[in-house]
Amino acid sequence: DVDVGDWVLAIGSPYRLNFSVTAGIISAKARSVPGQGTSYIPFLQSDVAINPGNSGGPLFNLDGEVIGINAMIYSNRGGYMGISFTIPINYAQEIIDQLREDGFVKRGWLGVSVQEVTKDLADSFGLDVPRGALIGSVLTDSPAESSGLKDGDVIVDFDGNEIIYSGDLPMVVGRISPGEEVKATVYRD
């Protein structure tokens, strides 16, 4: 299990400097990468220095266990700025297994655009705190439309996973096999 504040190590070959080790801490869990659109992966965010040549390398905890695969940095100037993103190892393993078995990655798809639930919206839905994913639009011929979801619905649980932020929904949906039926808890005004 990975917790915010855990020390981590990355091994890679930044700029062809083989077997380089950098250290840092886990800054956040279940992050979407800013500016990358919909994310199906709840990235680990850390301050481990990741540069060209580190992507695809392992991120270790201090027990020597691989906890993720280093994927990318967030930068407005192209170089490391202290924000790195790592694919959690359980997600990486699922992707590897699907690639070995099928040759491609299968992701569930709901067919909605979502936004955060504000305090005012939470009050109008009778939610004790702002949480969930507010459906802004439902695509035609999508699983969401087929299941009866509508613009303005708020999804607070999907397949037994609590949806706190709107970005949680695609991460949960993406792990479900296409065509699989699931239960959701939805508030409708």
Give, region by region, the residue ranges found by the protein language model.
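Serine-dependent protease modules
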Residues: 1-147, 157-181, 187-189
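Conserved catalytic motifs of ABC-family nucleotide-binding domains
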Residues: 152
